[in-house]
Structure formats: structure tokens, C-alpha cells
Amino acid sequence: MGIIEDTMTENRYDSPVGRICYWVHRVSVEDNPSAPWLIFLPGLTADHTMFEAQIARFQDTCNCLVWDAPAHGKSRPASLHFTLADMAQYLHHILIGEQIQQHILIGQSMGGYLAQQYMALYPGETAGFISIDSAPLENMYYAAWELFCVKHTEGMYRSIPWNSLVQLSAAGNAETAHGRAQMRDMMIGYTRDEFCHLAGYGFRMLAEAIEACAHVSPMCPVLLLCGEHDRTGFVKRYNKAWTKHTGYPLVWIPKAGHNANVDNPHAVNAQIAHFLKFVEK
């Protein structure tokens, strides 16, 4: 059991593709009537545990919600017949059910893409967006060959022995021993076939969402965070182009890879805290 299971309330939402598990912690209205809502969205194949350090830091002063996306973590079994827009709709239904209105979306990798899809579908509902090792959803940033390769990730993963894939993924996504151990723990919660199929499906779903997205214009402050040692695809290049094109502030997280909030939670938490002060002004 971790801090999320120990201190947050587990709730469930029955989506068309399966039951979705999520965890909620509310700050006492008497203690902080204006406490913001932080919505944590893990990346592809990751689960809620990747945000443990953020929950520990902010749950005393902020309302927090974190989920396991469909087919991830405890949100299994689930039918792999959903789009990124469907995921945004499921999240929207959850937030409505919890009576959460203005909120700050904090998405790591795939979670950042989901946040952008959410803001495109439900403009004006989000008070702030923090991208952690994610990239823009708009198709102008991507070459056709890049999206083609993304769509064929499953075959590449299946060509690698499972134990080797676990070790390579842990080393590729994290820089620290803790980050790599946490990535391994998330991966071994799946069978080999389950992981490869989920990853392949998720990347195809993402590529299709990017191809269909010509423009996203968040109606809120945006902060881009990226591990200085992120070696996942072209994430660093995408973030450089993203900040150049939009003017969104980009902060490089030291001593961190693709899972920057796990590798260097102190630096990421400091950036989140600073962002919250800016949004609350």
C-alpha cells in the first residue's frame, strides 16, 4: 500500500469500455475554502503510483484526483476500443460526478496529450495545464514518418524478450534508481502480451489523435516541464518547438528522464507550487 491508497478515497466510474478506478482527496472547506483541484494524469502503461510524490506534497493544501486510465493499473479489464477523445469524455464525466469545476490538469507523457484533448473538447473548464515530458497534440509538429513509426510500436516491443523489455524501458524512461524501480514495478503488473498490446494500441490511438488535430489553444496558463535527460522519442525536440511556437515557459528538470516527476520530485513539485501561485493571482 502506498500513500495514495492510505490517504485518498478510491472511487469507480463505469465507462463503456470498463470500470475506471480513481482516487480523490478533498481539503477541508473550513481549512482552505479556495483550495484548487489538481488532476493528475499518468502516462501510457503507467498507473496512479507515479504521482505519489506529488500527492504527498500537495494533498494538505490542494484537492487532488488521480486516475488509472482505461486498461491501466486497477482500471482493468477494459476493452481496447476507445479514442483519446473518449478518454477525455470519461474524465469529464468523472469530474462532473465529483462536482469538480475549475481545475488544473497535470499530465505526464500520454497524460499531457489527454489534457490537451480535454481542453479542446471542454474549453474554459481548465484553470491551468502542466505538461510533464509530454508534447503538443497539434499535427504541425510531426512528420508523417514519425507518426507511421509510432503506429508500429507493438511489433517492435514484441520482438524484445520480456525481461529485456522491462529493463530497457526502465532505463529508457528514468534516470534514477528509484525511478527505474518504480517503472519496473508498474510494468510487471502486466503480462507481456497485455503490456505490448496496450502500448501498441495507445501509440496508434495517439498517432490518430495527432493526425486529426490541427489546432489546440488552451484558455489557461500553461507550463512545460521536461527531464533534461529525456530520451523518449523526440520529446525534447518537440518541447523546444512547442515553447518557441507558443511562448509557453519550458523548464528543464535536472537529473531526470522521461518520468521527471518520479526521478526528481523535488524539482517538479517546486515548479508546480510556483505555477499554483501564478494561477491563483
Segments from the language model and where they lie:
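N-terminal cap/lid segment of alpha/beta-hydrolase-fold proteins
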Residues: 2-19
